[in-house]
């Protein structure tokens, strides 16, 4: 208990903050999940993925639908507002509804706390202090506070499952249970398919084959039957009802643009920024552009829209092949050297590649990179320096999700305090045996650059521009954050291939 008391105290303190935030701003995701409670409670299972009573149709895999169903019956039996369970009560909100839904996020986040506890206890004695700091760092994530406890989602629960499966993937733990939990996680939210290749290669290499590549047929049978059983448990009813095509059409809507309406800070944000600058600048130098393309067209995130004014348009297939090629490169190292740390690096990089180069990526997906990378961040100072621009850029890029004035103090103070904590970790990260030029001062200068950027976005832009160029502050933040995230990606990629063991 003693070594974990700091983690528990941090969890208790943060829970008070989260309860205090119950009345705060709620995004449309709050109504999305209320509607899913209503659908799974009031409609037969055959209608779950067919219902279009609300525009917020069920588009998560079956395990998440089952979870919403269980939550709905808990709400029903414990006397919460039953009107929230009526699918025809569109945009319904009541104090009881808010308390139940906000409270369910906090309770389910205990899975994350348990996973972090297991991570600390499974670490070597000499690494436990840093593991504890990492656990606190993850649980106090500004991203989880913003996205889950204000904006409204269940990422703490989902990433708790991911981190628990990562911890169990240590050879001395329970790799079969790790595979089972990760398979279940995919059946909760299919975005985790991005990192599935790393699990496949690692489990194949370590669990299904001996170090000299002799197949272990019993392990292959156990692994295969476990994974298949979990997917049958999730998708079995829809297989029986012959509704798999309908279910998949909800899970994978391909008619969206390359970028979300608010550009995620990835490679395509940089690409879009260059396109917009070229559109504005080239005509001044006598270059004729296609006047049929509006400056508002590039990557606004609208359905079916992904055209550019100057640069070539990007088809979905190209993003797939870029991600596939880069992930294969990462997986080759994992196949050759299948250690647990290399596995964590591969999970991080597979998620990172999908975030940087994937199609229609949401800014919230940056959690798939930051949280796994946190496990590696205190190996030594090189990893910490690679982590810092990612974490700072990623979390600051989430702040525009909260655009109401009442939430401004908490989002800036909490995120600022977390960044200040991160900047003190130099004392904890070991100095590497192989000294390299870490560009520490460059990283600090880059992070400091967010200060004038936010001053401009929050105060100067409105005074100078008025109602013109409303997209400019978001574009500047997304583009500047993308540089830091891309630089961190290159840094970890270098360490992954040259150092990680």
Curated annotation (Swiss-Prot):
It comes from Schizosaccharomyces pombe (strain 972 / ATCC 24843) (Fission yeast). This is Dolichyl pyrophosphate Glc1Man9GlcNAc2 alpha-1,3-glucosyltransferase. It is a multi-pass membrane protein. Signal peptide: none annotated. The chain crosses the membrane at residues 4-24, 60-80, 96-116, 132-152, 157-177, 181-201, 316-336, 342-362, 390-410, 413-433, 444-464, 474-494. Its EC number is 2.4.1.265. InterPro entries: Glyco_trans_ALG6/ALG8. It is found in: Endoplasmic reticulum membrane. It comes from the Eukaryota. It catalyses: an alpha-D-Glc-(1->3)-alpha-D-Man-(1->2)-alpha-D-Man-(1->2)-alpha-D-Man-(1->3)-[alpha-D-Man-(1->2)-alpha-D-Man-(1->3)-[alpha-D-Man-(1->2)-alpha-D-Man-(1->6)]-alpha-D-Man-(1->6)]-beta-D-Man-(1->4)-beta-D-GlcNAc-(1->4)-alpha-D-GlcNAc-diphospho-di-trans,poly-cis-dolichol + a di-trans,poly-cis-dolichyl beta-D-glucosyl phosphate = an alpha-D-Glc-(1->3)-alpha-D-Glc-(1->3)-alpha-D-Man-(1->2)-alpha-D-Man-(1->2)-alpha-D-Man-(1->3)-[alpha-D-Man-(1->2)-alpha-D-Man-(1->3)-[alpha-D-Man-(1->2)-alpha-D-Man-(1->6)]-alpha-D-Man-(1->6)]-beta-D-Man-(1->4)-beta-D-GlcNAc-(1->4)-alpha-D-GlcNAc-diphospho-di-trans,poly-cis-dolichol + a di-trans,poly-cis-dolichyl phosphate + H(+). The keyword Transmembrane helix applies. Belongs to the ALG6/ALG8 glucosyltransferase family. GO terms for cellular component: endoplasmic reticulum; endoplasmic reticulum membrane; lumenal side of endoplasmic reticulum membrane. One of its GO terms (biological process) is dolichol-linked oligosaccharide biosynthetic process. One of its GO terms (molecular function) is dolichyl pyrophosphate Glc1Man9GlcNAc2 alpha-1,3-glucosyltransferase activity. PANTHER family: DOLICHYL GLYCOSYLTRANSFERASE, DOLICHYL PYROPHOSPHATE GLC1MAN9GLCNAC2 ALPHA-1,3-GLUCOSYLTRANSFERASE-RELATED. Pathway: Protein modification; protein glycosylation. Pfam families: Alg6_Alg8 (PF03155).
